[in-house]
Swiss-Prot record:
It is a peripheral membrane protein. It catalyses: a quinone + NADH + 5 H(+)(in) = a quinol + NAD(+) + 4 H(+)(out). Its EC number is 7.1.1.-. NDH-1 shuttles electrons from NADH, via FMN and iron-sulfur (Fe-S) centers, to quinones in the respiratory chain. The immediate electron acceptor for the enzyme in this species is believed to be ubiquinone. Couples the redox reaction to proton translocation (for every two electrons transferred, four hydrogen ions are translocated across the cytoplasmic membrane), and thus conserves the redox energy in a proton gradient. PANTHER family: NADH DEHYDROGENASE [UBIQUINONE] IRON-SULFUR PROTEIN 3, MITOCHONDRIAL, NADH DEHYDROGENASE UBIQUINONE IRON-SULFUR PROTEIN 3. NDH-1 is composed of 14 different subunits. Subunits NuoB, C, D, E, F, and G constitute the peripheral sector of the complex. The keyword Translocase applies. Its main location: membrane. It is found in: Cell inner membrane. It comes from Francisella tularensis subsp. holarctica (strain LVS). One of its GO terms (molecular function) is NADH dehydrogenase (ubiquinone) activity. Belongs to the complex I 30 kDa subunit family. This is NADH-quinone oxidoreductase subunit C.
Length: 214
């Protein structure tokens, strides 16, 4: 482990000592986990001010709805080749605590260090996080993308609209319960002179490769 990296870790840990934050160094990267999502804005503001993290390079999220589950029935063999058949999972869209995690990537050019700050979100039905677009302008579009893809809302965001999907799009494509085929497909209708939407005609199927471990 780099001595400089350890030094940065200890200094940042001291700055955040008054908050519910856990930190670690893994694979040469510093990561801090915030326990309470209500503290996100305050902690990030403190990091920017006191350790000069002047750049927010990315905001993203992870959906852990199917974490640890498999699309393959490995318990029993149903074919002569030794492979089980892929199956479609039935997802329950009810609230699941800690289903979503939000991740911030920060850069301090003054201290020449990058860190990752993440937080598990407690309520999966009303997912609300304070926007940090007032701290870093780069968060504006990044938070819009997270909202568009995952359905996470950002309180006090100046313009929280979809940024990648079409107007009137239903659902959030990077959620694990969103079908891979989507709900509708679009094509240009020459008779109508416009784009029309139609239900998808593609059958949803498992396309996760079967991994065999010795």
């Amino acid at each position: 482990m780099s001595t400089k990296l350890q030094d940065h870790f200890e200094k940042i840990t001291k700055i955040l000592s008054g908050f519910g934050v856990e930190g670690c160094i893994s694979y040469g990267e510093i990561t801090f986990s915030i326990r309470d999502q209500r503290d996100i804005h305050l902690i990030l503001k403190k990091l920017k001010k006191e350790y000069l993290f002047e750049q927010l390079t990315d905001v993203t999220a992870v959906d852990y709805l199917t974490y640890g589950q498999s699309d393959w029935q490995v318990g029993k063999v149903v074919s002569q080749t030794g492979f089980s058949r892929g199956r479609q999972q039935d997802f329950k869209t009810a609230a699941v605590d800690n289903r979503f995690e939000i991740i911030y990537q920060l850069l301090s050019m003054a201290n020449n260090v990058r860190i990752r700050v993440k937080c598990k979100l407690k309520d999966a039905q009303i997912i609300l996080v304070d926007s940090v677009s007032d701290l870093w302008p780069s968060a504006n579009w990044a938070e819009r993308e997270v909202y568009d893809m995952f359905g996470i809302y950002f309180n006090n965001h100046p313009d929280l609209r979809r940024v990648l999907t079409d107007y009137g799009f239903v659902g959030h494509p990077l959620r694990k319960d969103f079908p891979q085929t989507g709900y509708v497909e679009m094509r240009y209708d020459e008779n109508l002179g416009r784009v029309v939407y139609e239900p998808v005609e593609i059958d949803d199927r498992v396309n996760t490769p079967r991994v065999i471990r010795n």
